[in-house]
Amino acid sequence: MADVEDRAAKGISDYDQGGVKTTELERKIEDMENKNQELTRENRELKERLERLTGEIEEMKDVEAEMNQRFGEMEKEIEEYEEEKKALEAISTRAVELETEVSNLHDDLITSLNGVDKTAEEVAELKKALAEIVEKLEGCEKEAEGLRKDRAEVEKRVRDLERKIGVLEVREMEEKSKKLRSEEEMREIDDEKKREIEELQKTVIVLNLELVKNVEELKKWKSKKKLTEEALSETQKREKELELKKDELLKKVEEGNKTVFALNERTMKPSNGVRDTNGGDQKGSLEAEYQWPVVAAGSVGAAGLVAATFFVCYSKLR
């Protein structure tokens, strides 16, 4: 009977171990599902970051196109200033020529005045020529004055243009420097973005592969969990049947013990109910000694049968 109880306790212990194993499977499946959700979230964040980087690259390209357009406009404006500068230089040259002509007229006038002692005709002619020269001189002076004003204005405009050209040249140099820096930065940013995009794409591929692997492993663990739960359910069912059989066997053992005890009591009594004072005591004692081993052997056999039956049932259960 003690052996039966030990085997029953061992069966309950194995059932507890099966429950622990099921708990470990459930925990591992839960960890796999959490990891799967984490990988899905990281994949979504990487896609959003890739879209944001692509938008930044497009904005950089728009800025570069706008800067190229501004450089074209500045070059056109510089060409217009160069043409206007050439026209002003031509006006300045004409003013110098007029000043030379006025100087020559003054020399002619002085020469004419020095010949006043000549004849009257010559004087008249000289006066006439002088009047013409004076008139022409006045016209030349007026023209020269106008040219001087024009020259001053032209020089002023030339200085303004030179200043503007200097400013534009400085701005052009700055813009070219900025353009070079921008192009260099754009190349660096573009290369960096490309490298980052390639790394992100590789990371996305790795995460997708790991996600597929985890999904397959999750399916495998779920299938294993289902098989374990089915086996556990079958074990619980068999255990209940075994408990019922054990209770029945224990009842039978208890009834057998009661029967053995009753038989022992009956065996210890005289066979005819009367003690023989002479040979009867010896005969009754022999009969009692003969019946007692038979009853004991029957009790031991019943207990052995019960233990063997329980052992076979328990072995089938395992």
Swiss-Prot record:
Major subcellular location class: membrane
Membrane topology value: Single-pass membrane protein
Membrane side Cytoplasmic: residue ranges: 1-291
UniProtKB keywords: Coiled coil, Membrane, Mitochondrion, Mitochondrion outer membrane, Peroxisome, Peroxisome biogenesis, Transmembrane, Transmembrane helix
Annotated transmembrane regions: 292-312
Protein's cellular compartments: Peroxisome membrane; Mitochondrion outer membrane
Region of interest (Disordered), ranges: 1-39
Coiled-coil annotated residue ranges, if any: 19-260
Any GO BP annotation: mitochondrion organization
Sequence ranges of Basic and acidic residues compositional bias: 23-39
Mitochondrial intermembrane-facing ranges: 313-318
Protein name: Peroxisomal and mitochondrial division factor 1
